[in-house]
Amino acid sequence: MKVYLVGGAVRDSLLNLPIKDRDWVIVGGTKEILLKKNFQQVGKDFPVFLHPETHEEYSLARKERKSGRGYTGFHTEFSSDVTLEEDLIRRDLTINAIAQDENGNYIDPFQGRKDLNLRLLRHVSESFTEDPLRILRTARFAANLMHLGFHIDKDTMILMCKMVKKNELLYLTKNRIWNETEKAFKTLNPHVYFQILHACKALNFIFPEIFFLYERRTFFSILFTNFYSISFLSIGLSKISTLTKDVSIRFSYLCQFLSEKIDFSSTKENYDDDSAKLVKKLCKRCNIPSHIEELAVLNTGFCVFLSSIHYQSSSNIIKMFSKIDAWRKPDRIYKLSFLCDFNLFYHQNKIDNSKLKTGFLKKCFFIIKDISVKKILNQGFKGYQIKNELNKLRVNKLKFWRMKKKCFFFKE
C-alpha cells in the first residue's frame, strides 16, 4: 500500500502559495485495511477516510466511467488494482494531476509541472467534458491564479464551449453553482470568473442577469460611458476585492450594476424596486445565503439614493435607516457605508469628491442610533405618537450635526 500527496497541496507548494488542505491518495489499499488502522470513513459516493490523528482526507485510488448525464453520471471503481495514473487521469487540469510520494518525488504523467511553469490551465484528457462542473472550476482557477499570469489553454476553452453547447450545464445543482461562485468571489480577481463564463457561453445559462450586463454594454456605454462599461465593472470588482474579503460586499458591488436607474444627479429617495426584485430573483434561484442576498438587494435598491447620500435630506436618511432595519441590524450600515464610499470616490468624474467625506453614512447612523425611547415615554407620548416623536428627535439631531459639520449641499 502506497500513499501519495495529490491535488491542490502539491500545486500550491510548487507555486509557493499557502497550502490550505492536504489530500492523499492510497494505491493498493482497501477499505478494510484503513478501518483496522482506525481511519474514519466519510462520503457516500466513494470511500473517503479521515486520518485518526491529522483528520486529513485519504481516498482510495479510483477510476471513473461515464454512465449518465451531468456531474453525477459516473460509475466509480476503487479496487486495490487501480493505479496512480488511472486515478490522476480522471482529474480536471494537469496542474491538479501531480502526485508526490513520501520521499518527495513527483509523479507527473500529464506534464502538470511544465504547465505550471507555462502558467497554463490545460485539461488532462478528453474526459474533461464528462463533468460540467469543470467549466466553473476552470473559470474559478483562472480567477484564483490570474495574479500569477495563468491563462486557459485554447483547446481547453474549445472543450468548455462544446460542453455548454451540449447543455451539460443544465445538470448542475444550484448549490454546486453557488459553491464554485462563492470560491471565485474569494479570489483576488473574481471578475475573471465571469469573463471566462461569458467567453465560453456559459454565463447565460448560469447567471442570465449578469450575462445581460455584457450584452447591453454597447448601447449603455454611449449613455453611461464609465458606469455601464463592462471593463469599468471588472476593474471596480477587482479594486474592491483588494479592499475587502467580504463576499457579501463583493457580490453586492457586482449586483448594483443591474440597476437601470443610476443617476448621480438625483436627490430623491428613489428606491429602485424593480432592480432590487431582479437581484432577489437571482439570489433565490441560485440558493445564495440570505445574509449575502439581503445586502445585495438593499445596495441595488438604494443605489441611486446612496450615490447622492451627501445631498439627501436628513429626513430621507432616517427613512432609509428604518427601511433597511438598521436599528436591529447595524452591520448593514457599515457594509452599505463601505460600498457607498467606494462608489462615490471611484466614480470621480461624476461627483466633485473634494467636498465629500468618507464614512458619511456610518457617521450619520452613529450620531442618532442611541436616542432613547425612555425619555419619550416619560413625556407621556403613547401609541403611534412614540414613533413620530422618535423620528422627529432623530431627524433634528442629524440636522444639527450636519449644520455644525457643514455636511449640507442643499437647503433642507
From Swiss-Prot:
GO terms for biological process: RNA repair; tRNA 3'-terminal CCA addition. GO terms for molecular function: ATP binding; CCA tRNA nucleotidyltransferase activity; magnesium ion binding; tRNA binding. CTP binds at residues 8, 11, 91, 137, 140. Keywords: ATP-binding, Magnesium, Metal-binding, Nucleotide-binding, Nucleotidyltransferase, RNA repair, RNA-binding, Transferase, tRNA processing. Gene3D superfamilies: Beta Polymerase, domain 2, cca-adding enzyme, domain 2. It catalyses: a tRNA precursor + 2 CTP + ATP = a tRNA with a 3' CCA end + 3 diphosphate; a tRNA with a 3' CCA end + 2 CTP + ATP = a tRNA with a 3' CCACCA end + 3 diphosphate. Its EC number is 2.7.7.72. CDD domains: NT_ClassII-CCAase. It comes from the Bacteria. Mg(2+) binds at residues 21, 23. Transmembrane segments: none annotated. Its cofactor is Mg(2+). Signal peptide: none annotated. A single active site specifically recognizes both ATP and CTP and is responsible for their addition. Catalyzes the addition and repair of the essential 3'-terminal CCA sequence in tRNAs without using a nucleic acid template. Adds these three nucleotides in the order of C, C, and A to the tRNA nucleotide-73, using CTP and ATP as substrates and producing inorganic pyrophosphate. tRNA 3'-terminal CCA addition is required both for tRNA processing and repair. Also involved in tRNA surveillance by mediating tandem CCA addition to generate a CCACCA at the 3' terminus of unstable tRNAs. While stable tRNAs receive only 3'-terminal CCA, unstable tRNAs are marked with CCACCA and rapidly degraded. This is CCA-adding enzyme. It comes from Buchnera aphidicola subsp. Schizaphis graminum (strain Sg).
